[in-house]
C-alpha cells in the first residue's frame, strides 16, 4: 500500500481548513484515511499549523511520502525529518 501524508479539505464553502492525514495514495482527497496527524488553517492570521511531531516522524520513518504542500507545512512547524 503506497501511503501519502496529505491535506484533507474541510470547512464551509470559501472558508476552508485542512486536516493533515495519512492516506492510501489511491483514495480520493476527502476519502478514507488511515490516521489524522494534525490540521492547518490558512484563514487565521497568522496561519495555524498543528502537527503531532511523533506521528509525523513515525509515518515518514515507515515510508509515507508527504506531498509538496505538506513538506512545506512540516518545515514551517519546525519538525525535523530525517
UniProtKB/Swiss-Prot annotation:
The record's listing under PANTHER family reads:
30S RIBOSOMAL PROTEIN S16, SMALL RIBOSOMAL SUBUNIT PROTEIN BS16M
Q: Does the entry feature the keyword Oxidoreductase, yes or no?
A: no
| Protein name per UniProt | Small ribosomal subunit protein bS16
Keyword Methyltransferase present in the record's keywords: the answer is: no
Recorded family membership: Belongs to the bacterial ribosomal protein bS16 family.
Which UniProt key words apply to this protein?
Ribonucleoprotein, Ribosomal protein
The protein's gene is named rpsP
Q: Name one GO cellular component term.
A: small ribosomal subunit
Query: Which GO-annotated molecular functions does the record name?
Result: structural constituent of ribosome
Pfam hit, one: Ribosomal_S16
Annotated InterPro entries: Ribosomal_bS16, Ribosomal_bS16_CS, Ribosomal_bS16_dom_sf
BP GO terms, sorted: translation
Q: Which domain of life is it from?
A: Bacteria
